[in-house]
Structure formats: C-alpha cells, structure tokens
C-alpha cells in the first residue's frame, strides 16, 4: 500500500490497506476479500490496457488509482449553471482525511452532480452543501462519468428549496439507471436516484422499498459513497 502511495496511486493504496479489515467488516469475509481482489485486478488490467480504452473509461481508471486532476483543467470544462438541490451527503474517513460527498440535483437541467470536500481529522468540514437546501452555482464536471463536479464559486449562494416537485423514477427505472452506470464505469459504487415506494420486506426478511411492481433492497453499513 505504501508503494502505491509513493507511486502517486493513493486510492489503490487505500484499497490495499482496507483489505486487512475485511474480516472485521463482513462475516462473509472470504467472498468479500475475493471480490475486492478481483476489483483491484480489474483496475490494474485496465491501466495496462489504457491505450485501447475510450476516454471516459480511462478517466474512471485514473479516479480509481487516485491520480489527481488539476482544478484548472476541470474549470476549463464547459460550465453547467443551475439551481442545485442538495439531496443528501455523507462523510467518509479516508486515512487521516475526512471526505464529505454531497449529491446535488439540477432543477433546470435534471443533472446529478457530486461535490467532494476534504478536511484533515479534527478539522471542521465546510457546511456549504447542506441536505434540504439549494445552491445557485456554475459547476464544471470532471472528465469521465463519475458525476464529480467542481464549483466556480467557493461559497455559492444558498437558500431553501421551494416549489420543487421532482419526478421520481419507478424502481425498474432506478435499476436500469444503475445498470447503465456500471456499464459505463465498472467501478461505480453509487448513483443517486429519486424513487417512489413504500417500505416492505423481501423473501429473506430484509428491508426493501417496493412500488407494487418491483422491489429494491435497502442496505446499510460501510460503503465508499452513498
């Protein structure tokens, strides 16, 4: 793991470090370990074959390795101006750094975006993107299909969400959106979706969401992004 960090591939180094904790996180540790090793192998093979991959997939490989993208390069991408509803956020520990992932939905464009803010342990993260509010911002998206974006303004204007009635997806539609996301990026670990349904339990007694025609399992516990 340390060698990966030295090689400027910190995200891959983090994956290798986390392998030691798989047994503590999952009772089915052997299966989880095999799956993670398979993911790492796929990243390595994709890097070796990067010259033959489409640009979006190469960008996804760079992200999985943790190769940095200069802010100037991101801000050179076309801007997307909108009133963005902050639908949710999650704080994740990444070594000695805490990362806050905030999911934004553009009211005009219907686009999703993910803003990531970082702070060292014991430092306070900025509270710009608070769930249940909206921000007026011009975003620039990172290369690839990860939905990660960067705002032109360090402190965009914020306000309450008013007169917003989003059109939810049926559960089948949410599943199709996830399928398309994984097809475009095999390492995708989360995609936001607004769905309609009610709580239920599946045949195994696990909590799920149903709209009467399909069911979506609800899971908890450790994850990279939500």
List the model feature ranges, each with a label.
Residues 3-8, 14-53, 59-92, 99-101, ...:
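Long, compositionally biased intrinsically disordered terminal regions
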């Amino acid at each position: 793991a340390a060698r990966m960090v030295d090689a400027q591939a910190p995200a891959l180094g983090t994956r290798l470090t986390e392998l030691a904790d798989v047994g503590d996180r999952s009772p089915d540790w052997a299966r989880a370990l095999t799956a993670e090793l398979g993911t790492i192998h796929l990243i390595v093979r994709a890097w070796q074959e990067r010259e033959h991959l489409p640009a979006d997939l190469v960008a996804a490989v760079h992200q999985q390795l943790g190769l940095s993208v200069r802010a100037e390069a991101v801000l050179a991408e076309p801007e997307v101006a909108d009133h963005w509803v902050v639908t949710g956020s999650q704080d994740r520990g990444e070594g000695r750094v805490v990362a806050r992932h905030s999911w934004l939905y553009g009211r005009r464009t219907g686009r999703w975006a993910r803003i990531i803010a970082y702070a060292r342990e014991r430092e306070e993260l900025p509270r710009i993107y608070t769930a249940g509010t909206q921000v007026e911002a011009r975003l620039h998206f990172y290369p690839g299909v990860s939905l990660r974006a960067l705002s032109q303004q360090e402190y965009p204007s914020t306000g309450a969400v008013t007169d917003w009635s989003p059109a939810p997806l049926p559960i089948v539609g949410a599943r199709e959106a996830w399928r398309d996301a994984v097809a475009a990026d095999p390492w995708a670990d989360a995609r936001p979706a607004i769905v309609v349904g009610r709580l239920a339990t599946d045949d195994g007694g696990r909590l799920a969401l149903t709209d009467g025609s399909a069911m979506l399992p609800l899971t908890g516990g450790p994850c990279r992004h939500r």
